[in-house]
């Protein structure tokens, strides 16, 4: 008679493959259940984003500017004029609150088009404390000079966001700034008047970016630059700003920053000999709406 113990073992051996398969299926099912991410049904409300996928941004800002202007206009390259500090010598304002407006279009995920306007208009009347030679005119000590110096910049900028994540973005930009300059100096008792006006397009290359520290706090920076090195003219233009923003909701934010705008031109051209060194810089307060 067969061993009774062997008869007891045989059924267990027969069941072993089935038990092993069942255990493997259970383990696989548990792993599948563990790895599957939880998803919301289509009808469930989605959480609101911190930043909307906007197509239009309107920014209004106030710049507390501290202008610094130095210039010299020569009668000829061999007869230099007098170097003038426009704030000290002519009495132009050395601080001014400047409102500015920017409109940014975002036609796609990586493209931006910005329209901007920047203007600073100043005028003053002062009795001169030194003789000044400006172009081919001489202004004498004690004479009252009424002066005007206005600068308006209209900007059109295209940007491409080559890095774009949920937390940060970096864009390369190319812009055209239309500079409109008006200067005027008048001595009324001698009927002496010297005025210059000019409009010029200025191409600028730039880079800008944003980084989100949290759902509400971000830092952003922007810089545009142009340099010219020709036979008779050397110059550069810099427009840069740095800011920190606080987002009240996905559609509205407030920011505090600093902006500097610099023009530095040195000319040895026979018709326009001289130099201009203009800096407009100061703290910036702005509000931006997204639509």
Predicted regions and their residues:
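Bacterial N-terminal signal peptides
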Residues: 8-18
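Transmembrane beta-strands of outer-membrane beta-barrel proteins
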Residues: 59-63, 114-118, 173-177, 222-224, ...
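Residues that define the transmembrane beta-barrel architecture of outer-membrane proteins
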Residues: 54-56, 95-99, 150-154, 168, ...
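Extracellular/periplasm-exposed beta-strand and loop segments of Gram-negative cell-envelope proteins
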Residues: 68-96, 119-151, 178-199, 228-232, ...
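Outer-membrane beta-barrel transmembrane domain signature
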Residues: 177-250, 261-264, 291
């Amino acid at each position: 008679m067969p061993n009774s113990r062997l008869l007891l073992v045989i059924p267990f051996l027969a069941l072993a493959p089935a038990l092993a398969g069942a255990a493997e299926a259970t383990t696989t099912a548990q792993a599948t259940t563990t790895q599957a991410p939880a998803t919301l049904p289509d009808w469930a409300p989605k959480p609101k984003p911190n930043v909307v996928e906007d197509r239009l941004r309107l920014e209004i800002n106030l710049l507390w500017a501290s202008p610094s202007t130095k210039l010299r206009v020569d009668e000829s390259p061999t007869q230099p004029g007098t170097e003038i500090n426009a704030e000290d010598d002519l009495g132009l304002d050395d601080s001014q609150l400047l409102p500015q407006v920017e409109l940014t279009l975002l036609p796609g995920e990586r493209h931006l088009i910005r329209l901007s306007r920047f203007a600073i208009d100043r005028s003053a009347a002062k009795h001169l404390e030194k003789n000044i030679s400006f172009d081919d005119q001489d202004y004498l000590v004690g004479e009252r000079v009424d002066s005007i110096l206005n600068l308006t910049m209209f900007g059109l900028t295209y940007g491409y966001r080559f890095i774009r994540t949920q937390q940060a973005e970096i864009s390369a930009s190319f812009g055209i700034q239309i500079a409109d300059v008006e200067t005027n100096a008048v001595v009324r008792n001698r009927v002496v008047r010297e005025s210059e006006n000019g409009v010029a397009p200025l191409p600028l290359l730039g880079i800008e970016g944003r980084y989100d520290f949290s759902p509400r706090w971000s830092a952003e920076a922007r810089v545009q630059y142009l340099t010219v090195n020709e036979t008779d003219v050397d110059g550069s233009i810099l427009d840069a700003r740095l800011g920190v923003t606080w987002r009240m909701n996905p559609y509205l934010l407030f920011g505090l920053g600093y902006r500097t705008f610099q023009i530095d031109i040195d000319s040895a051209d026979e018709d326009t000999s001289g130099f201009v060194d203009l800096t407009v810089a100061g703290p910036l307060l702005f509000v931006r709406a997204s639509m």
